[in-house]
From Swiss-Prot:
The gene is lpxC. Its cofactor is Zn(2+). One of its GO terms (biological process) is lipid A biosynthetic process. Gene3D superfamilies: lpxc deacetylase, domain 1, lpxc deacetylase, domain 2. It comes from Rickettsia prowazekii (strain Madrid E). This is UDP-3-O-acyl-N-acetylglucosamine deacetylase. It is an enzyme of class 3 (hydrolase). It catalyses: a UDP-3-O-[(3R)-3-hydroxyacyl]-N-acetyl-alpha-D-glucosamine + H2O = a UDP-3-O-[(3R)-3-hydroxyacyl]-alpha-D-glucosamine + acetate.
Amino acid sequence: MHQSTLLKPVSCYGIGVHTGKRTQLTIEPAKENTGIIFIRTDISSENNYIEASYCNVSDTLLSTTISNNHKIQISTIEHLMAALWGCSIDNAIIKIDGPEVPIMDGSSKPFVFMIECAGKKLQNAPKKYLKILKEVKVVNKDCELYCTPSEHMAVDLTIDFSSKAIGRQNLSFGMQESFTKNIADARTFGFIRDVEYLKSKGLAQGASFENAIGIDEHDKVLNPSGLRYADEFVRHKLLDLFGDLYTSGISVVSAIKGYKTSHAFNNELLHKIFSDTTSYKFVTSNEL
């Protein structure tokens, strides 16, 4: 298999779920071995670019934020990163004229649609993978996330909320190709009781039923259209996991199991993997 990029640039407009600011985002083709690079076009400086790397993750409160050494940041990258992973885009330049990726409808589906509209181009370089060689695990009280050696990607994820609207949900997923059909349109979610507090902290400024699932104090989903899936909540947590793991720079080949995961946990797992060179190796498709 070869690396891929877009055939042509594609753009969208939208508001940030936390900043409430309207931004334009453009995904552009990039050369082989570039990876995913974000550029803040509203900042006229040669230091306005940030590599979408786990090492550059600076905040994981409610979303994933990346920053560079010059304190320039871009937040809520995970849904776009998941779409790039799900569409097998290895190399892209993301230009954005603000501090946060547009939330769109709260899922990855709009970004998948953009990529499909732009088209995909195969490049003259082998696709690379991160193959896990031994178990790597992160645990915090009853939350855990670990990966073990496998010949292909396989994920088993469980969430457990006290809210009866969500409860305990489990999902197993194995084929990257089915991400766009079965996971990409699962939306982010939140509790109405938390909204005022979050807004007082400068968060959730752009949140609405147009871009998130809202749950009230009676454990009722308030969105007029309801849920897209009975287990949409765990599907979205899986989407977040894929987006966060793609900050490794390449697709991970491993059996992954998680319970009550978070953006912080996802990032911690990558740091732990890369801290031990005996736990992984980089391979091409011919070496899988």
